[in-house]
Amino acid sequence: MTQPLPGARAVSAENELDIRGLFRTLWAGKFWIIGIGLLFALIALAYTFFARQEWSATAITDRPTVNMLGGYYSQQQFLRNLDIKTDPASSDKPSVMDEAYKEFIMQLASWDTRRDFWLQTDYYKQRMVGNSKADAAMLDELINNIQFTPGDFTRAINDNVKLIAETAPDANNLLRQYVAFASQRAASHLNDELKGAWAARTVQMKAQVKRQEEVAKAIYSRRVNSIEQALKIAEQHNISRSATDVPADELPDSELFLLGRPMLQARLENLQAVGPAFDLDYFQNRAMLNTLNVGPTLDPRFQTYRYLRTPEEPVKRDSPRRAFLMIMWGIVGALIGAGVALTRRRTI
């Protein structure tokens, strides 16, 4: 059995970590560790007083109710009923509330909506420095401070929007203003679509009514002409009374003269007095056209959403997180203090 050489034993002893010695050294330098740790924690504390603060407010939204849409709902539903009459398949469309909320969500998440919102706020104007590049960079940052998260129906999560500002009241007030701003833009777009659809339906209904009138007038003219021709034949043949047992309504036009001159004259006068005959569908279309000619009554401020979580002033600051920074930098300071203590021990 071989024995380790004395030199090898000495090298092994030098490479072993002296745990007791390490802790004695750290204990001896505890004032350095605690002092530098406290110093870094105090520096972190001071930083939190001067660093820019970030507070965030959150809102959760869902589709509006019928009452919130006001007159827009009834007018849009009126147009839909016209469409269903001509095309029954159009009844499968999403509800008016769903379409209004879809437009609201589109505006809420839109980059242009966020940009236009910040440009008209005092919050942005008060922070402008007059430098185009700096102001553009700040505007871009503010745009990114409005964060929209779409809902997920599979996980029962609703749409939500978060706004970050420098103070808690600003975060709350600006988020409320932004949601209202997006809703107003959505209402404006929906009103424009309503006006366009209303005008298109008016043109269509006018064309349909005119077509029905032309058809009725053509039938009337043909009927008058048939009776006039039959009356001439009856006068030529001196037929003064009915010469057929067939009911008048069942006689073809070529045999109407058999009714006799008096009856034909009476039928002609009655037809001329009554004028063209229109069916019920024509009068319904005329009533619809009269309503369409009045035009839509637009409400520029109807609400296209409802809150499931109304924005409130946040109670906790997002950044800087004072306790976290003090603990983190206190630990960093303690590690640096431990390094200083070990270095001083070796030099001694």
Swiss-Prot record:
Name used for this protein in its record: ECA polysaccharide chain length modulation protein
Membrane-traversing stretches: 31-51, 323-343
Key words, A-Z: Cell inner membrane, Cell membrane, Membrane, Transmembrane, Transmembrane helix
Quaternary data: Probably part of a complex composed of WzxE, WzyE and WzzE.
Subcellular location as annotated: Cell inner membrane
Protein family (similarity comment): Belongs to the WzzB/Cld/Rol family.
Tagged with keyword Ubl conjugation: no
GO molecular function, one term: protein tyrosine kinase activity
InterPro entries in alphabetical order: Bact_polysacc_biosynth/exp, LPS_length_determ_N_term, WzzE
PANTHER family associated with the record: ECA POLYSACCHARIDE CHAIN LENGTH MODULATION PROTEIN, TYROSINE-PROTEIN KINASE
A cellular-component GO term for this protein: plasma membrane
Organism: Salmonella typhimurium (strain LT2 / SGSC1412 / ATCC 700720)
Gene: wzzE
Lipoprotein in keyword set: no
Entry-linked SUPFAM superfamilies: Bacterial polysaccharide co-polymerase-like (SSF160355)
Pathway note: Bacterial outer membrane biogenesis; enterobacterial common antigen biosynthesis
Role, per record: Modulates the polysaccharide chain length of enterobacterial common antigen (ECA).
Short name of any one Pfam family annotated for the protein: Wzz
Membrane topology: Multi-pass membrane protein
Superkingdom to which the source organism belongs: Bacteria
